[in-house]
Amino acid sequence: MEEEELSKLLANVKIDPSLTSRISQIDSFKLSELMVLKTDIETQLEAYFSVLEQQGIGMDSALVTPDGYPRSDVDVLQVTMIRKNVNMLKNDLNHLLQRSHVLLNQHFDNMNVKSNQDARRNNDDQAIQYTIPFAFISEVVPGSPSDKADIKVDDKLISIGNVHAANHSKLQNIQMVVMKNEDRPLPVLLLREGQILKTSLTPSRNWNGRGLLGCRIQEL
């Protein structure tokens, strides 16, 4: 690869130094500053996901052929660098959210809000809006609870109940919240063609298929 081409590639995939500098100050930022930084991190992540989508590749797609050679249909170097940056920014975002929760709890304590730990977590989740998708819908069974909730194939999942990008634990927590809320509506936040959509999904066995949702969810 020519030096000029490499420099252009690096410019397209590197994290803005000013963003990196602000990330390093997460533990000293005020809550308002963290919310601005959260938006900027999410914007950068969306840009990276867009590049991967343009190449028709995800975070876990193979970059080599069955014979062990680099794929010729994707920019392997670019994808590798973007994946590395995405993982770094996801970790930074989790750190930011954890710090935000600490500051929110301190704020509520200072106001002498008397609530139990579960109620406080709910307040935290309402105060911080998660907009980064962490999974996508690869299949929806007709007539299923997911179908009735107007969930479509290729929709990206931002949150279901109180499960979001920062706490889904490899999608395991989705199963837990779904089982806990059988026959009770769950708020769902989706990303569809660049638009954030809200819907209500009621997990149920009262349909002709298997499972409580009738859809297949895969991690991004």
From Swiss-Prot:
**One GO term (biological process):** proteasome regulatory particle assembly
Under InterPro entries, the record lists:
Nas2_N (IPR040815), PDZ (IPR001478), PDZ_sf (IPR036034), PSMD9 (IPR035269)
Keywords annotated in UniProt = Chaperone
Q: Among its keywords, does the record have rRNA-binding? A: no
Q: Which domain of life is it from?
A: Eukaryota
Query: Where in the numbering of this chain does the PDZ domain appear?
Result: 119-196
Keyword presence, Chaperone: yes
Record's GO cellular component terms: cytoplasm; cytosol; nucleus
Q: How does it assemble?
A: Part of a transient complex containing NAS2, RPT4 and RPT5 formed during the assembly of the 26S proteasome.
Could you tell me what this protein does? Acts as a chaperone during the assembly of the 26S proteasome, specifically of the base subcomplex of the 19S regulatory complex (RC). During the base subcomplex assembly is part of a NAS2:RPT4:RPT5 module; NAS2 is released during the further base assembly process.
Q: What is the similarity comment for this entry?
A: Belongs to the proteasome subunit p27 family.
Supply any other comment. Present with 846 molecules/cell in log phase SD medium.
Name assigned to this protein = Probable 26S proteasome regulatory subunit p27
* Native organism taxonomy: Eukaryota, Fungi, Dikarya, Ascomycota, Saccharomycotina
**Chain's gene name:** NAS2
